[in-house]
Amino acid sequence: MINLTVKIAIDGPAGAGKSTVAKKLAKLLGFTYIDTGAMYRAITLKVLRENISLEDEERIVEVARKSDISLDGERVFLDGEDVSEEIRKPIISQKVSVVSQIPEVREILVKKQRKIAEGKNVVMDGRDIGTVVLPDAQFKFFLTASLEERARRRYEELKNKGTEVKYEEVLEEIKKRDSLDSGRKTSPLTIPEGAILIDTTDLTEEEVVERVYEAIRKNTKGEI
């Protein structure tokens, strides 16, 4: 019996398997899944749609402030429109790190993310969940994998969706995202204090979910 809300934070770089593991874990536990990366992608999509320069931080912040982003399971809605597929396009992946490193944008979205998580048992994944968004989360995990494996996964994902892309291009894109994510001034990608580190390079999705689930059960004496 869960008497208080449980927060599970899953962080890690691009292609480490965060979203896949978080979705499966949330389903297994019956928790709400919150994809914070999708929220940054939604803002990026709107910025590109409105032909706003990525250097115009003031207008980008205004977009973040005025946009209505809601999540329903794995579906993402921007101002009432389902943009779940559109935000996964390569052009969004290429630009999202530029938008997400703007401090005011992060501040606005962190508030939205905390509000969504209020009063719920949640599994939230992103790049600053255990450090900034939910620093008091009872469970923190940091997933990682080799650069080559992360690029391979993203390449396969795009290929399966019918997107024409070269592996080398995906590899370069992930290198750039790693650099931006780790080097940004606000909420850089770091391993949260007390987080359980899992290298997913040679593990299947199911094996990672099992490790996370067992760690949670062990620390709650099987109550979850």
Swiss-Prot record:
Protein name: Cytidylate kinase
Organism: Caldanaerobacter subterraneus subsp. tengcongensis (strain DSM 15242 / JCM 11007 / NBRC 100824 / MB4)
Keyword hit for Oxidoreductase: no
Binding site for ATP: G12, P13, A14, G15, A16, G17, K18, S19, T20
Positions of transmembrane segments: none
One Gene Ontology CC term in the entry: cytosol
Family annotation (InterPro entries): Cytidylate_kin (IPR003136), Cytidylate_kinase_dom (IPR011994), P-loop_NTPase (IPR027417)
Locations listed in the record: Cytoplasm
UniProt-recorded Gene Ontology molecular function terms: ATP binding; CMP kinase activity; dCMP kinase activity
Record-stated family: Belongs to the cytidylate kinase family. Type 1 subfamily.
Keyword set includes Zinc-finger: no
Keywords linked to the UniProt accession: ATP-binding, Cytoplasm, Kinase, Nucleotide-binding, Transferase
Originating gene: cmk
Main location: cytoplasm
Matches recorded under NCBIfam families: cmk (TIGR00017)
GO BP of this protein: nucleobase-containing small molecule interconversion; pyrimidine nucleotide metabolic process
HAMAP family: Cytidyl_kinase_type1
Top enzyme class: transferase
